[in-house]
From Swiss-Prot:
Residues 1-57 are annotated as: Disordered. Residues 81-142 form the SH3 domain. It comes from Rous sarcoma virus subgroup A (strain Schmidt-Ruppin) (RSV-SR-A). The gene is V-SRC. It comes from the Viruses. This is Tyrosine-protein kinase transforming protein Src.
Length: 526
């Protein structure tokens, strides 16, 4: 199955400059003004260049590889302290008449921010009014508006971004410290012959007077001054600050404001990407502008009412490692509109031409990305029920995202619901789920262990040479797949932990994610 990024690729990636934003203040406007969408002129478009990100050496295994795993920081939130003037962090092209197009750097007056993730705003540049995605803007003249400020991203996320081989030494970002409330951390890429590419983290401490410092001998009144100073002088850092770390536009929360149940006529199916037992997957466009993937379900696959109810839950699951559900056509044949992932399913990717070139560190990083998405599913008390390589989608730079979460329980086909029917994925299913229908996050953990064998064997069917009935019988009697060729014993041990008979003895996805963390990172004072 295939799927994607919701906007054309070119404007979604850019390398940031160190120049501070314009600090000019602008006045307000009448709050009663009605939306009037007009495309903003192109005079403010910032030149961009493509980039990838890199995943690093896993704890269990050596090396590191390319993999974009981090979305842009979530900067904007509820209006605080009466602040209504915001600055655009990215270009945004509206998709419906009530939305507002804007360019990076535009100042926007917020009219209404009480309607969730889409705010009513007025551009002080173009004079137009309409709805904007709230995660594309930040309060004017705030730390959140600085291009080098990444907010609450984790240490691991910062490492993934900074370990891009395209980044020169000294590429950096500032983030909130994970260990000290109110403090910040400066993360900087470095290189030496012994360690190769690595990341150093420097804690930025705050003075009682409001200033900031890394070392007490050199103090600054603001973070902006600190960054400006260290961009000219290393002064104890591994390297002076050179480039702001590149990142990608965040996903908007849905296709547009109030675009959830959409008319079938608004979708155009263009290229068939795949076909399964229950339907097809197409690359297409929504409203003639937005690249999406469209999953079409055969009539009778599931109840439209049950699907719509489940979809209301699914659309609230938002994580960088889950394929985003954009919209639905709820009448049969049901259409599910999701983000488009350019490389299709992980299973096809592993078995295809690109799979030949994947090495163990890359495969383990893909597993780490999947574990990250499933750790979120775990935290949300949700269950996938059909976790396997065929239901993982791959994008540019080896980005992996979990798809089809929750749909399995809605399927009404007898060959599937019988649990031992021809269409049921016995080889991926935990014994308690296959035999007794006990699907839990722990049965998903079992499936993840099977998925690890798919990764390490480049898409080989699990339990080679065995039929479904034999697999179920032998697994019940204690059989577990042996270590695949060229797979480290440490990784096979992780698989076996996932296949423990007692579901409660299986690890959590949080634990599994931690076991696949990068290790080529040097800590400095965090």
């Amino acid at each position: 199955m295939g799927s994607s990024k919701s906007k054309p690729k070119d404007p979604s990636q850019r390398r940031r400059s160190l120049e501070p934003p314009d600090s000019t203040h602008h006045g307000g406007f009448p709050a009663s003004q009605t939306p009037n969408k007009t495309a903003a002129p192109d005079t403010h478009r910032t030149p961009s260049r493509s980039f990838g990100t890199v995943a690093t050496e896993p704890k269990l295994f050596g090396g590191f590889n390319t993999s974009d795993t981090v979305t842009s920081p979530q900067r904007a939130g509820a209006l605080a302290g009466g602040v209504t003037t915001f600055v655009a962090l990215y270009d945004y092209e509206s998709w419906i008449e009530t939305d507002l197009s804007f360019k990076k750097g535009e100042r926007l007056q917020i009219v209404n921010n009480t309607e969730g993730n889409w705010w009513l705003a007025h551009s002080l540049t173009t004079g137009q009014t309409g709805y904007i995605p709230s995660n594309y803007v930040a309060p004017s003249d705030s730390i959140q508006a600085e291009e080098w400020y990444f907010g609450k991203i984790t240490r691991r996320e910062s490492e993934r971004l900074l370990l891009n081989p395209e980044n020169p030494r000294g590429t950096f970002l500032v983030r909130e410290s994970e260990t000290t409330k109110g403090a910040y951390c400066l993360s900087v890429s470095d290189f030496d012959n012994a360690k190769g590419l690595n990341v150093k983290h420097y804690k930025i401490r705050k003075l009682d007077s409001g200033g900031f410092y890394i070392t007490s001998r050199t103090q600054f009144s603001s973070l902006q001054q600190l960054v400006a100073y260290y961009s000219k002088h290393a002064d104890g850092l591994c390297h002076r600050l050179t480039n702001v770390c590149p990142t990608s536009k965040p996903q908007t929360q849905g296709l547009a404001k109030d675009a959830w149940e959409i008319p079938r006529e608004s979708l155009r199916l263009e290229v068939k990407l795949g076909q399964g037992c229950f339907g097809e997957v197409w690359m297409g466009t929504w409203n003639g502008t937005t690249r999406v993937a469209i999953k079409t379900l055969k009539p009778g696959t599931m109840s439209p009412e049950a699907f719509l109810q489940e979809a209301q839950v699914m659309k609230k699951l938002r994580h960088e490692k889950l394929v985003q559900l954009y919209a639905v056509v709820s009448e049969e044949p049901i259409y599910i509109v999701i983000e488009y992932m350019s490389k299709g399913s992980l299973l096809d990717f592993l078995k295809g031409e690109m799979g030949k070139y994947l090495r163990l560190p890359q495969l383990v990083d893909m597993a780490a990305q999947i574990a990250s998405g499933m750790a979120y599913v775990e935290r949300m008390n949700y269950v996938h029920r059909d976790l396997r390589a065929a239901n993982i989608l791959v994008g540019e730079n080896l980005v992996c995202k979990v798809a089809d979460f929750g749909l399995a329980r809605l399927i009404e086909d007898n060959e599937y619901t019988a649990r031992q029917g021809a269409k049921f994925p016995i080889k991926w299913t935990a014994p308690e789920a296959a035999l007794y229908g006990r699907f839990t996050i722990k049965s998903d953990v079992w499936s993840f262990g099977i998925l690890l064998t798919e990764l390490t064997t480049k898409g080989r069917v699990p339990y080679p040479g065995m039929g479904n009935g034999e697999v179920l019988d032998r697994v019940e009697r204690g059989y577990r797949m042996p270590c695949p060729p060229e797979c480290p014993e440490s990784l096979h041990d992780l698989m076996c932990q996932c296949w423990r008979r007692d579901p409660e003895e299986r690890p959590t996805f949080e634990y599994l994610q931690a076991q696949l963390l990068p290790a080529c990172v040097l800590e400095v004072a965090e």
